[in-house]
Regions:
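Expand to "…catalyze enediolate/carbanion chemistry for C-C bond making/breaking, isomerization
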Residues: 1-111
């Protein structure tokens, strides 16, 4: 974190991307704290501020829509809302629900 301004000053960069889980672990925090701990919020804001000051796009992994909205309000302009596995699972649950199931049961196959 002390070098974030120097990192943002590297010629040719268009943006930077924050991985909150990696950042939390590097700060000695647990994953449950990756978007709630005051030290994490300060770090995230510091990174976003350094990117903005350097004219870079600041990106972050949010993991869900609510966190994504909160990160957009903090100034992040590129936000991933889910991993591939999260998106596939949610999509499958929605399709099962639409087909008459509740999305929580395992597929039984043909009987």
């Amino acid at each position: 974190l002390p070098a974030v301004a120097d990192i943002c000053a590297v010629p040719g960069l268009a943006g930077i991307y924050v991985g909150p889980a990696d950042l939390a672990i590097s700060m000695g925090l647990g994953l449950a704290e990756m978007t709630t701990a005051p030290a994490m919020i300060d770090a995230i804001d510091s990174i976003q501020g350094a990117a903005a000051a350097a004219g870079l796009v600041a990106g972050i992994h949010a993991g869900d829509g609510r966190t994504g909205k909160a990160m957009a309000q903090r100034g992040f302009r590129m936000i991933t809302l889910a991993s591939e596995s999260q998106a596939l699972r949610r999509g499958a649950q929605d399709h099962l629900r639409d087909a008459g199931g509740d999305g929580s049961q395992d597929a039984k196959g043909y009987n």
